[in-house]
Structures are given as structure tokens and as C-alpha cells.
Amino acid sequence: MRFIQTIKNIFKIEDLRARLIYTLSIILIYRLGKYVSLPGVDPSQLGQLKSQTSSGIMGLLDMFSGGAFSQASIFALGIMPYISASIVVQLLGIVFPYFQKLQKEGESGRRKMNQYTRYLTVGILILQAPTYLVNLHAQLPATAFVISGTFFTISSVIILTAGTIFVMWLGEKITDKGIGNGISLIIMIGIIARLPQNFVFEVGVRMNGAGGLIGLIVEIVFLFVVILGTILLVQGTRRVPVQYARRIVGNKQYGGVRQYIPLKVNAAGVMPIIFAQAIMMLPVIIAGYAQNGSGFMVAFSNMYGFWYNLVTAILIILFTYFYTAITINPVQMAEDMKKNGGFIPGIKPGRKTVEFLDSIMSRITLPGSFFLAIVAILPSVAVQATVSPQFAQFYGGTTLLILVGVILDTLQQIESHLLMRHYDGLMKSGRVKGRSGATTSI
């Protein structure tokens, strides 16, 4: 009853209701674009392309585009070129002083960074669109192309580039006038769109003898446990207490209260998995071009093999430490605390505070990196346990982390709208308590 009442409260708030309707409308436009094929391609002959993109790297690309990749759609390249550009610009902000300065300039700097990201996205699209067209020609018969030659190539590159830019614009509109982060929501919708189809396929496989009903129930229970573990990973924090000095200005008293710095167990997010998979793509690509590849190369090109997943897990652990080190700055945190009259009880301000924060991050990053590596290779483990590759994608990796992260973020935004207007929220927070000052939010 409480949940039903909360849903009613959502639609009572005019601003929240308008934002939800706007978000759903944008999502509908995005989903409809999937069914608009590139001019010059016969949609009735796309069956072979769909079969080639049902699993593996192509399957991931198709899932992140919501199935548009296998439909030769105007949105076939999806939002991933923009994500790639965002990652590159973010890394530039770590390496080059000019971009570091932009990051510290507030709103004006953010606008410039966004503009550079858009320019880089167009550059990536100009390179990626012809590659996609080459793949189309390789997978489809010649009769699938009503138009061919230079005109088809140039027009398709322009349309694919415009399609991704339009999807970017839709995401920004959701962020500005809707609910949640628009780009993240578009990726999530693309993933969820494949879930019903892949689940029905898995049910069919099980019901036709491979494990039966019992096997299907075990799969669902295990998936539920994995989702709970991923929520703990995404939400897990170590809260560091910070005491602020008491100040009296006129007749008012400021400070004197204890607050907390929430240090996330998985501060690196999904980035280590993306970096590791990008590196592990090289053996797959090389093995694809080499006709007589060595046993070493063949072993590392098998996405579901032992060696591939072992190296992937090691890379994820290393990248988790690397990315956490460049995104979490204990020196800056200690300086900010000192400027605002704050200190950690029992720890001297300055260098001791930096060392204390650094030691905490090292301790919580270790289990976080191992759990992230486990989540990343779970789809391969699921495939080895006879789960179909299509459905196994939902057992972990970037797929599950994105789903859990975006859903929780969107629910928290809706929750904040409800609480601002004195309504009960959607979620009840719980805490797994550890030592003093250390909790894991659920």
C-alpha cells in the first residue's frame, strides 16, 4: 500500500509529473528511431546481421544501442562514441594543465569541456561510421543494398553521424527538463530493451531440455543474488567523521557539528571494466584478421575462456587502483577541510590527514577492486554454466553495473522531489554497520 501511495504522490506533484512525462516522451522518440533503417538498405534482409550480433563484442554494441546496431538503423552507433569522447576528455583533464584549469572554472569551464567532447564525438563518428558500413557490406548480401557506391557511403556516414548527435541532444534534454541523467538513461533503456527478448530465449532453451524448470529457477535466484551484491558494491561507502570548529558570528553560532565524508568502496565506477575490455579487444581483433593465429593468441581471443578472463580480472584490479588514485585526491580533501575549519577527530590536520585518508582509500579499494573484477567476469562464468550468451550479459559486467547505477540514481532524484514536498520517498535506506564511522548504505 505504501508503494501505491508513493506512486500517487509522484503524480500529485505537477513539476515531477511533467518531468516524468517529458522523459518518457524522449525515450519513446529514441526507441522509435531504432526502426528507421539507413536509406539504401533493405530491412527484410537484415537477418544475417542480427545473428552475427547476438553475442560477443558485437552483442554488447548491439545491446548498448538498444538493438539499433543490428537493424542498420540511423541510430546504429548509439551514444557510445559520445561516451568514448567523454572518457578521453576526462583523462585529458588529468594529464594536461589547460584542461585541469577548465575543470576548476565552474560552469564556464564545464561548458567548454562539453564543447570539446562534442567536437571529439564528431571526429570519432567520422572514423567509426565507415567501419560500421564495411561491417554491413561484409555481413549482408549485395542484394540488401538498394543503393551502393560512393553516394551510399557518404550519405550513410552523414546520417549515422547526425543520428548519434541527435541521440546526444535527446540525452541533454532529459538531463535539463526530465528526470535522471539523460545519457545514462538512454544507455539503460537500450540495455533493458533487450532483456525481455533474451529472457524469453533463455526460457525456451531451458524448457526444451537444458536444465528444465529447476535450472531456470536456479538461474533467476542466482541473478537476484548478483543484483543484490552489485547494489552493495555501487552503494557501499566508508563514512569518515569530520568535526568542524565552533564559530560565533554576532549572535549566531556556526559549526561545532559532526559531519561525514562518504568514501565509496567502488569510487572508480564502471571505468576499470571499460579500460580492461578495451585492451582485451586487441587479441580478439588480431585473431580475427590472422588466418593461422598462434595458440596463445587464440586462447586470449576467446571471451569466455580462462586466460582471457584471468587477465581481464587482473587488469580491472590494476585499473581500479589507478582510476581511484586519479579521481580521489586526499591532498585536496585535506586542504578543503582545513580551509573550512574541519578536522578528523584524533588526526592532526595537514599531512597526517592526507595519510589517514589515503590509507582508508587503499583498504576499501582492495575488496572493491576484487568484487568489481568478479562482477566483470560473471557473464563468462554464466556461459560456462550453460546460460545462453544473450542472457548471460545481464549477470554482470558493464551491463549490470550501468543498470543498477542508473536506476538507483534516478530513484534518488525522484526521492528528493518527494521529500522536498514532504511526501514519503520510494526507498527506505538501511545500513550494514561496521566499525565506528564505517557503514555500508543499502
Regions found by a protein language model. Give the residues of each.
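N-terminal cationic and glycine-rich segments that engage phosphates or anionic surfaces
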Residues: 1-103, 108-442
